[in-house]
Amino acid sequence: MNILIISFVDDNFGDNLIRICFESLLKVVLKNHHIKDYTINRMNLKDIDNNLLISSDIIFFAGGGLFGLSYLNFYKYLDKITKIADEYNIPVIFSSMGVNNMDATKETEDKLVDILKRKCIKAVSVRENEDLFRQYSAETSLTIDSVCDPACWSEYVYHFDNISSKRLLGINVVRGG
């Protein structure tokens, strides 16, 4: 099975941490279901590789504010990727998604609604704005459930359980602006 994990990769440590933690959680799920024959590939949201997409058996969006309606224009990439997945009948799962709606317009909101209507979209979980996602998916059969951000599992992914309480570690995972 060829699994593709898509995430936003840039200089924001939080987005990278989301992908790393999501992949770790996915590996636990695969192990718990005794699935051993798989390959995990990764793709940056903004570096679309058509060959990688069409060779995938399933596509996961790792989480974060990818349903962004802001200046980052994530919806344009989600649109292109899910159109390809729809054309090739590749199931897509959105995991622990967020909505960054700083500059939301009717046009961008309509585009997200259209994306969620695609047949390739099989599941959506959200880390925030559950009611807004329910509104966007109202014309679909999708069930929207809340989960924590994958980065919440970083203490287990990085084995922070043995750190002394006298030594603290701080991680900046919030985008400025």
Where are these regions (language model features)?
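Active-site anion-handling motifs in enzyme catalytic cores
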Residues: 1-177
